[in-house]
Structure formats: structure tokens, C-alpha cells
Amino acid sequence: RRQRQMCIRDSIYDEQGIRENARRLRKAFAWNPGYREYFAVKAAPTPALLKLLHEEGCGCDCSSMTELMISERCGITGENIMFSSNDTPAEEFQMADRLGAIINLDDLTLVDYLERSIGHVPEKICCRYNPGGVFTLGETREGFQVMDNPGDAKYGMTRAQIAEAFTRLSAMGAKEFGIHAFLASNTLSNDYYPALARILFQLAAELKAETGVHITFINLSGGVGIPYRPEQPANDIAVIGEGVRRAYEEVLVPAGMGDVALYTELGRFMTGPYGHLVTRAIHEKHIYKEYIGVDACACNLMRPAMYGSYHHITVMGKEDQLCDHKYDIAGSLCENNDKFAVDRMLPKIDMGDLLVIHDTGAHGFSMGYNYNGKLRSAELLLKEDGSVELIRRAETPEDYFRTLVW
């Protein structure tokens, strides 16, 4: 019944899965009274999902004007927004300030730029830290690390710069300070957050002693990953939360900072496993390889083409059949990297079969684009009662042409 309700090339999300995951996260950090998750809007900027997560206690991590506007229209404002941006235009700082968001400064030069942009310095403010070098957990890391070389990353301030920023911001009227850092993406290790926490907790204790500022929160940002391959172990958020708690007790509490609130900015972890792209097999091609052409393309899911990322694929109705056929699963873009899978072993695929591409609930639809004049597909929400709700309609040619001047 649900299959008949779904159009071709739809993205569908699991409400129950998202809610239960948000509750597990909240429970894992319940030991910290000020804890708050700011969902990374860039991962899935769809109002129904933002509202759903807000009902579960999550705020919004925004990084652009339109993300701020989406949050506002969802009724999420004030300190329920963390504005973490870089190379930021003045008008975006002005919008964030108007909404009462917590502003996270990416660079020392933004201290004066922010004051010029909004006419003052907020009483509560955050600065992003980049320790430089190469971040490693001292073990073999699984999964595709998008950024684990902070010294080569454009984000954040050096140790000396963040100390100077705190001193200057304090003199300009700031009263509450936060520290933020993001060192690695999609980590499959329960040790990542605890390791990052120790770095930031130690830094906070040092900065408090050096500058005398009141540090009221530490933002661990994102980076907790998901297993895109079935054989990969999932992170255990309860174990992660306990690891962060131990670091908190060992570093912050002895420094007299046992009241510091913890924030996170998880995106992929929150919704990634609970979204799927459904596409139909419409062509087969037999040349030097075996190809299955589907009606979705990289415009619907860019990650395999852009990063070479693996997304598991299920052929609906053939879950128990032997995977004895090797295929490239391709879209119709005029780009040879428009492939969802390369040399993938799957059951025999017949024309008309529905293929489910897994773990597309974050950085999937949101990274879509219109190359070749392709139109973005619809988004659906599988409700807890089993019904399916349209949460974003499919684009039409009229949408595509609307900005053109003929």
C-alpha cells in the first residue's frame, strides 16, 4: 500500500525512527542540565523535519540566510538557533542578531566586522577553534573521513586567536562565552566525541584562567557518523555520552567549571539512517559492463558522484534473493560519475523494479541541484501511524523557469 503511494524518485523519511533517535541522544546527555542539540539544518532543510525535531527538544544549527529564515518560519528563534557560519556577509549577521541566535564566530577578523554589522556585540557569543595539525584517534578509523586534517581546513581560529578574541569581545561587552570545534566528519568511533571533548574542556579551563571570561557552554558540533555499509558497526550514543561525562568530570569539574552546558550540532546522525531515496529501473544496457538505468540521478543524491560514497541498495521484493549479478546503477546525467553504485552485486533487476537507496536522510535531498535541467523530487514522511504525508512537492518545469528572463 505504501509503495503505491510513493511516486518515482521520492525521498521518504521515517518519523518514528527520527523521534526515537532524538530521544536516545537526549538521554545520553541527560547528565548535563544545559545540554541542547542544534540540528544541522544543512543536512535536511525541510520544515516538517525541523518541526519534528524541535518537538523532541532540538534547536537549529544554521549557516546561511535562508536557513535562518526557514528556522524562523518554523517558529524556532532566539537561543534555539546557533548561527555557525564562515566568510559571513553582514546581512546574515544582522538576521541572526534580529532572531536572537547565538552567533559563532569563525575568525578573529569577524570580531570587529560583527560589531560594525550589527552595531554591538551580543552578550552571549561563541568562537570556533581549530587546533591545526592532523586529528587522529590513534586507531584505525572506519568510514569516509571528509575532514580529519584541521591544519588544512579553512575553519576556526588558532589557540592564540581565540584567546585574543575572547579578551576583545569581553572588553566590547560580551558576558557569556562558548567554544566550538569540528575536527572530523562521519566518524565511526565511540571515542571521537570524548576525545574532542577533552581537547575543548582543557582549552576552556586554560582560557578561563588566562582571560577571566565566563565560559558557559561548549559546542561539540557534529562528526558522529552512521554506518553506510551493513557490515559497519553503529556508534553507541549512550557510550559516547558516558565518555564525554567522564572527560567533563575529570577536566571541567576540577577547574570549577561544573556548570558548563554542552551543545551538539548533529545532522547526519539525527536523520541520515531514517531517509531513503526510492527509484525505478527503466533501462538496462549491456556493453563492457552491465548497467541498470534508473529514473533518479546525482541531482537527487550527489554523495556517490561527489565523494565516491557508498550507499546500500535494496531491490524491493527481492531482499531474500541471491546477489549474483554485478551492476553499475546509473542515472541519466551527461556525466560518467552519475552512478549510485559501481560493480555492485545485487539480485537480477528487471525493468520496473523499485530500488531503495539507503541512508539518504542527511546531505541527500539537501545537496540536490538542477544540472541538465533535472528537477528535484518530492519528499515524503512515513508517519508513526503508518500514513504517508507529502512534506515537499516535486519541482515542476515552471519552478525551474521562474528565475529566467526570456
What does each of the following model-derived ranges do?
Residues I12-N21, A28-F29, L52-E56:
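An N-terminal, well-structured beta->alpha segment
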Residues Y129-V134, L183-N186, G222-I226, R268-M270, ...:
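Glycine-rich beta-alpha junction loops
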Residues R1, E249-L252, M257-W406:
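Charged (often Lys/Glu-rich) extended helix/loop segments that serve as interaction or gating elements
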Residues D14-R23, E37-A44:
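Short secondary-structure junction/hinge motifs that connect adjacent elements
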Residues E91, N186-L188, L203, E210-H276:
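Glycine-rich phosphate/ribose-binding loops and adjacent secondary-structure elements
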Residues Y35-F217, I226, A247:
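Active-site-proximal beta-alpha core segment in soluble small-molecule metabolic enzymes
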Residues Q3-I8:
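Short, small-residue-biased leader/transition segments that mark boundaries at the very start
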Residues Q16-R24, E164, I199, G243:
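A non-catalytic, amphipathic alpha-helix used as a structural packing/dimerization or gating element
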